[in-house]
Amino acid sequence: MVGQRIRYYRKTKGLTQEELAQGICSVSYLSKIEKGDAKSSDEVINLLCERLGISPEDVDENQILEMLNEWYLLMVDRNFEKAEEFLHNMVQPKMKSVIEPNLILRYELFLSRFYMVHHVNPDLEGSYKQLKRTESFFDEMTPDLKFYYLNFLSMYYNIKREYKKALDLLKEAESLYNTKTTGITQSEGAVLFYHLALTYNYLCRVTSVSQYAYKAINIFDKEYNYSRSADCQILLGLSNRRVGQYEQAEFHLKQALKYSTTFKDDFTNGVIYHNLGYVASNQKIHSKALDYYFKSLDAKMKIPNNETKSTIMLIAKEYFLADDKKNAKIWLDKCFEVLDLKLIDDMYYHIITLKYRVENNFEDLVEILSKGVIPYFEKLHMWEFVAEYSEMLADIYFDQSLYKKSSQYYQRANAALKNII
């Protein structure tokens, strides 16, 4: 293990083997020490460690490993406040004396996840910097550390909306997990399956969502981890809605609701009611949709700093679809109260598009659909919205007797729908 430490700290300090070995031992002898192939003398080890500024003494690795894994489990179980407290009171003080490379890499990887999922101030770029620090040691990582690295980097790309990159990393992590030599637990495998289902959901790959969501549920249910099972049920609800299986969608969402209402989980309640409203809206049951949306908003507003603009937007949209323009305008104004106009994202396009529809401003609506909205969602491979907005534009062109343009966008909508498989 001391050889591993010497190699790790030599690389972090930017030293070549020749530079470290100079005046202490031969380069070939140092190479053998780093690989663990040589029976090294204490004197040589002490001199090498002294030059690197590290101690040759081992710490209680099992104790540190257990502590780091306990911290990680708090994050996986979404006990974010406890995870933060544990980091400051336990992890950081003890890590000051740790020099074992694998423990440091584990700590830095887990820290990257902590930055990413922080419940108050997530630091996405801080997380990415942590991951980049560990990247140069990927080839030397143990299989379980490689698994974590791939998982966490995929989470980063999912948040950045680069779903193809995220999926490639998750499939690589799945290959590692399937070798059964990683030391990764079954419950961590379930989290991997959930992230695969989540990423396929972003890409509207309905069949793959079901495949991985059910895999994850089978493990979560065995371990009585009903919170994570509920997350998977929500994904199944979303997928079934996309393909028009509304009864199945409602079934899965209400399965998740059993958990969230029992444990008074307002965050999950907000997500579920939001999606139940969307199911009702797709069926054109406006009063039912609005009832669910208001329940979602009530639940979301019980949590400080929670995201509400997507539900507010859907309330405005539902009033518009119900031909209640007065309330549509009232709720559209509320959308603009929480919308950051400098951030061009999904919500920006959904809300601006709705604004032009409510105002009957077809000139600006055609402009933003053709040049902004549709290309934006195509780039993200978000085919559901590509289909929705392409059909909307096709209908406008049809009403204007621009049949060639109308046909082009109907074809574009159909092509997008074929990607929802």
Language-model region placement:
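A short, Lys/Arg-rich alpha-helix, primarily the initiator
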Residues: 1-12
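C-terminal non-catalytic interaction modules
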Residues: 7, 348-421
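Short alpha-helical DNA-recognition segment
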Residues: 14-31
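DNA major-groove recognition helix of helix-turn-helix/homeodomain DNA-binding modules
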Residues: 41-58
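Helix-turn-helix repeat elements of alpha-solenoid scaffolds
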Residues: 44, 75-90, 117-133, 162-175, ...
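Tandem amphipathic alpha-helical repeat scaffolds
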Residues: 67-78, 108-120, 147-161, 188-203, ...
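Amphipathic alpha-helical segments of tetratricopeptide repeats
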Residues: 88-96, 128-139, 171-182, 214-225, ...
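Alpha-solenoid helical repeat architecture
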Residues: 99-105, 140-148, 182-191, 223-231, ...
